[in-house]
Amino acid sequence: MKHLPKHLRPRWRYLAVELETWPDERIGRRSFQRELWYAGQNLLGDPGSADADLSVVRYAFADGRGEAIVKVRRGETDPARAALACLDEVDGAPVGVWVRGISGTIRAAEENYLRRRGQDSEERNVVFGNEERVAVRRDSVGDVRLDEAFVGATDLDYDLA
């Protein structure tokens, strides 16, 4: 079978996406892809979801933070951003999703939007609620571990032990 000429091939845009969740959660590529498809289908319907053709091309996730490159048909970037905004949890784990930028190539999306990572996280012992607890700190905010969950806090909410 012959290849299509360049002017007949579908054109793509690549969304650079940043993910954040609790430090002990693990979110896999397949789970993220499935939730993205469901969000697109629920928001855009079957025809709109097929037009956008959302698919995860690159994915990395560790220590509660992750990055993804989502491939979208040209002209469908706004519906794709809206579908990404509808994601609030993946596999039962709450997740924050930010579209860092849109590019015409995977390489440009990675270089321009995903390589500006903040500080790495560190574990510290803190006093929170009159008890010593473990907190995972990123920049000036921390996630304090309670019995079965985390609580988001800033440096003003706890004392370093």
Where are these regions (language model features)?
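Short beta-strand/turn micro-motifs at beta-sheet edges
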Residues: 2-6
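Helix N-cap motif at beta-to-alpha junctions
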Residues: 71-77
